[in-house]
């Protein structure tokens, strides 16, 4: 499946990735803004965690392509890395960084475990 992205152009996803993208857990990311409240100041800053996650897969593939030219990477490992990129924001909540950074209601998501 190919998904057309405004930043990266066409991004290709395999059947397993599409089945993950189609889950309610990933689809909920469509409703979470990547930049939280920034769109109140910058009205066009409205991209979502969903769009960001798709773009992360694109960037990850570019890295994998570069590494593959130097190293013999296991196809299964590349598949796991792409899926990890797709799911890296799966636990985000709306305004999550605001709760982490400004209100100190939650530990930072990138500093140790949240669970």
Give the positions of each predicted feature.
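Short, mixed-charge, low-aromatic patches
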Residues: 9-20, 36-39, 73-77
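Generic detection of long, well-ordered alpha-helical segments
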Residues: 10, 50-54, 113
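Short amphipathic alpha-helical segments enriched in hydrophobics
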Residues: 24, 64-67, 94
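Non-catalytic interface/linker regions that flank or bridge core catalytic/transmembrane domains
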Residues: 1-31
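Active-site flanking loop/helix segments enriched in acidic
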Residues: 20, 28-51, 100
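Alpha-helical phosphate/pyrophosphate-handling elements in metalloenzyme active cores
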Residues: 41-79
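Divalent metal-dependent catalytic cores for phosphoryl transfer on phosphate-bearing substrates
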Residues: 77-115
């Amino acid at each position: 499946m190919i998904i057309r992205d405004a930043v990266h152009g066409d991004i290709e996803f395999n059947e397993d990735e599409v089945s993950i993208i189609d889950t309610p857990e990933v689809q909920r990311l469509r409703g979470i803004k990547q930049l939280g409240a920034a769109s109140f100041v910058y009205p066009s800053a409205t991209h979502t965690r969903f769009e960001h996650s798709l773009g992360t897969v694109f960037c990850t593939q570019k890295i994998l392509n570069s590494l593959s030219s130097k190293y013999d990477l296991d196809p299964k490992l590349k598949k796991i890395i792409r899926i990890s990129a797709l799911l890296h924001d799966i636990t985000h909540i709306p305004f999550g960084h605001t709760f982490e950074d400004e209100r100190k209601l939650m530990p930072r998501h990138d500093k140790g475990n949240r669970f």
